[in-house]
A protein has these predicted regions:
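Non-catalytic structural scaffold of enzyme domains
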Residues: 1-284
């Protein structure tokens, strides 16, 4: 929910539809073909809601599906990789990336950074144990610290000056990671930068809304109470969550993605209570 929190910070006037594809987690171990299929299903459903923008708030789906789906929907689709990479090259020369296995294998961050700054040096580490520990509320446990030490050691050995959170779960680990890395290391949270890109895009398109936002609408493909409990710890309030069965996403005419995606809706749709210019995050 780190992207959602940034939406609240930078675009408080926008209403949000938030979709979490919890039934098909984790995305980080899925094949590129599976991830693309999930993304298309989710985006199709978002299109039915009349959204005006989608932020694909999952690094794995941003890395493996964004280019394939951009330009195929009646709204802009933004991803995390490019905004995060651009921020990193502005801050450092020796960049570490911690991410899921799928994101690391895609080399999406490395390609984006080298394209922006050919002399940049990049090291990537897959961190598959982080998400289960975070979702198990084990952020401050001895096990988390030991796992983090193991994952970060190769990056510390390279004397990195910048670290990218290559998964939207990872900013929750800041208290742990900052105790392990040099205080001079810059931390890059792509969520901050993708929402800043969304602000610029909305302004350029004349779609930015003014006024008071309506309450965020939360949907999940898995059990709603479980997601509500976890999300409440990170949001500071208890969200009202509705379950959206996979059968709805997979029906003809529907399409979606996994991970957090933010969509902004200009027109009402009978499937969802009408929203005036709503932002909708899709979460993996």
């Amino acid at each position: 929910v780190t992207v959602l929190r940034e939406l609240y910070n930078q675009l408080p006037q926008e209403s949000v539809i938030y979709f979490a594809d919890t039934a098909r987690l984790p995305y980080g171990t899925r094949s590129p073909q599976e991830i693309l299929q999930f993304v298309q299903e989710i985006l199709g459903w978002m299109a039915q809601q009349g959204v005006k923008m989608v932020i694909m708030a999952c690094n794995t789906s941003s890395a493996l599906a964004l280019e394939a789906v951009q330009g195929h929907y009646p709204f802009p689709v933004l991803g995390l990789i490019l905004p995060g990479a651009k921020a990193a090259v502005r801050h450092g020369q020796r960049v570490g990336v911690i991410a899921t296995s799928a994101t690391v294998t895609s080399n999406a961050y490395q390609r984006a950074m080298v394209e922006a700054k050919p002399q940049i040096q990049v090291w990537q580490v897959a961190c598959p144990q982080f998400v289960p520990l975070i979702e198990g509320n084990q952020i401050h446990s001895p096990e988390m610290r030991q796992v983090a030490q193991t994952y970060l050691q190769p990056l510390m050995d390279q004397d990195i000056d910048t670290l990218i959170y290559g998964c939207t779960h990872y900013p929750h680990l800041a208290p742990v990671l900052r105790t392990l890395l040099s205080p001079t290391v810059q931390f890059i949270n792509p969520a901050v930068h993708v929402v800043a890109a969304a602000v610029r895009e909305l302004d350029a398109l004349g779609l930015r809304r003014s006024g008071v936002a309506q309450p965020t609408q939360f949907y999940t493909s898995g059990p709603a109470p479980q997601f509500a409990t976890v999300a409440s710890q990170w949001l500071g309030y208890q969200p009202q969550v509705q379950m959206l069965p996979l059968s709805v996403l997979q029906s003809p005419g529907a399409g979606v993605e996994s991970g957090i995606a933010a969509a902004i809706a200009p027109t009402p749709n009978p499937t969802v209570p009408p929203l005036d210019n709503a932002l909708s995050p899709l979460l993996t």
